[in-house]
Amino acid sequence: MASNVFQEVIRDRILYIIGFYTLILAVAMRILPEIAASTEGKIFLDFGIALMGVIGLIVSVFVGTGLINKEIEKRTVLVLIAKPISRSEFITGKYFGLSAVLAVLVTTMTVIYLGFLQIAHIPYGIASILIAVLFLFLQISLINAVAISFGSFTSSLLAVILTFAVYLMGNISQDLLKFGRLSQNPGIEHLTQALYLILPDLSRLDLKNQAVYGLQALPSPTALAMNAGYGLLYSSMLLAIAILIFSRREF
């Protein structure tokens, strides 16, 4: 199942996405010296990783939300679940297949990004960038799990909207918690605490701003390990929920 998803998605415009990333980086490298003469290196470092994240997010959301609904709409899900394959294998196969695509996509974009840094003679810390990219992959893999979870029980359009909402709220979940404390309103504070517990704290997996300053700017190895474990655990919980919901659906 995972290999089928991988082959299907890889041949479905992934090369165009990589080409688009390369083109945007080339344009940015050309125009940044004209608009930010003294800080173009730092901006390009930030921009390259941020663009990777945006592209990975788009692929995760739009492909992930449609993986299950496409099978349902085409009625091929009936054939698949009739085979000696459990519904849990169906969900996890979809997840790991798309995660493999995202891994290939992120790896390829990273190689291209590092190539541009070399061409432009922009100093960078290879270790910090690779760690940031690894955590970026964990983040978009988590969003992949969110997308598949919503796609297991809603329409593709609603799943896209809900997944983007989770992404946006997940990036400001710590700010929501601080806002609740500052409000000094028990009702608002309880609401923001509940949202923080439910929503993924995606800021734990976002290291792009620190990575450009080198390893010394990154969290400690213990904090990195805990944050990586958090991302993996949250993704596993989402998959468990998706499997539970999908196993109760009738076709």
Question: Predicted regions span which residues?
Answer:
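Aromatic- and glycine-rich beta-strand/loop motifs that create alpha-glucan
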Residues: 1-16
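Terminal transmembrane helical anchor/hairpin motif
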Residues: 35-38, 158, 163-244
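Short cytosolic juxtamembrane segments of multi-pass membrane proteins
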Residues: 247-251
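Secretory targeting signals
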Residues: 23-67, 91-160, 193, 221-222
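Residues that define the loop-to-transmembrane-helix transition and helix capping
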Residues: 16, 77, 88, 157-160
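Hydrophobic/aromatic residues in alpha-helical transmembrane segments
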Residues: 57-64, 77, 112, 146, ...
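Helix-loop-helix units of permease transmembrane domains in multi-pass membrane transporters
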Residues: 2, 66-99, 246
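Helix-capping/transition residues at the boundaries of transmembrane alpha-helices
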Residues: 8, 69, 80-82, 147, ...
